[in-house]
Amino acid sequence: MRVTGGIARGIQLRVPTQGGVRPATDYIREAVFNSLAAFVPGTAVLDLFAGTGAYGLESLSRGALRATCVDERIGTDLTANAAAVAKSMGLAELPFTKITGDATKPGVAEGRFDLVFADPPWELWQTKGAEIAA
């Protein structure tokens, strides 16, 4: 798995080997970001069900001003991915916030966001789909 565009293009992202994490493929994220290319620069991004942080980090690579990643389990992979992207962008630190919390709950992340990515695990989508969509 890698960053598909922007300054950090090609940077490998770590993915947990346990816990059933199956992040969106590079191909899917690239298609999403190609569709949104004109809208990403200068935005504040919220990445719900962040897992590896791929959507938030990809957004920063493509010019977003800040990204907030929310997941019930913020692990070392997300932290390592943020550090790798920051290094590739020549930054000591990214404008990046990690929140450990339930992404289905309103108000889990404070502030105003221009783009929101919500890519929940399939099982969660089946049990809480209506709640997530609200």
Language-model features: locations:
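Class I S-adenosyl-L-methionine-dependent methyltransferase catalytic core
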Residues: 1-134
